[in-house]
Amino acid sequence: MESLVSAFVVDLHIVLVLAVIAGALAVIVKGADLLVDEAVALSVTWGVPKMLIGATIVSLGTTLPETAVSVMAAARGLPGLALGNAVGSIIADTGLILGLAAIIGVVPIEKRVVNRQSWIQVGSAGLLIVASLPFLSLRTVFVDGGRIPQWVGAGFLCLLVLYIWRSIAWSRRDSATGAAGPIAIEEDRIHPTAHPVVSLLKLLAGIALVVVGSQILIPAVEETAHRLRIPDAIIAATLVALGTSLPELVTAIAAVRKGHGELALGNVIGADILNVLFVAGASAALTPGGLLVPPEFFRLYFPSMIFVIAVLRFGISGSRDRLGRPAAIALLVAYVITVAAGYLLPVASL
């Protein structure tokens, strides 16, 4: 869709391009508001923590752009782009988006639920690295890279189904034992009037608006940047890198603005898990012979991913009932370090 938008805006007058940007922003904001409202309504109706709603339904929707981009890249013989999209999104979601969310507003932490999902996040990142290793030629991994076999990609998709199933089971258990968090307090503030199916459809509509709006916004902003003669390197480092993570960003900002920061936390952690199991998994499973892993991933991008996730893990462990401002600043600093390393260290581009 982005290519169609790019072809459409390239011949438009700058005023019309700015109008397209304004319209896309309006669609994104409306979609994010609808997404957050209906996610909270489902949380209250089902007695499920908002963090789990964010980690499952919402993150499944917001990671669709990454999945589409990575699968198409793998099909075109661009493994670096396919895997780089997934790993780059994990770094941006965790460092930039969650860091900004915790700076802008309050991100509550329900320790039992967050720790459970966070360790799955850590485990999935580690699993991605292990699955990429060429165990018969480990000495040359930094030169020749590795490969995620096709059957491993299929296994990732099976683990995705298991993750969603276990999340549903955990939510039911937490609800039954009263460990689902402050749901009762939410019921005093929010009174869902629609049937859960209607709320779910509205939530999906909100996700669609956010995703479609993002697909329109990025090419329009990129065209404006070109006309303003902004260097391509700056465009690549900002607009292109942020493009597929924009749904998570606007969802996080809308969530904390409305006082539902745990939804933002759940969306980011869930998106990280799905970027491994869904995005990388689908890319490898649909690529004959498996997904090649260029050597620069072992030299830079995998360590960067683990570094940012470790900062979040320490931030959660050192926080009580919310992700504190020091942890938020640490996440942003970690993100800046990883981006700077990508430009300063002598590694090949994705």
Model region roles, listed by residue range:
Residues 1-350:
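Hydrophobic alpha-helical segments, chiefly the membrane-spanning helices
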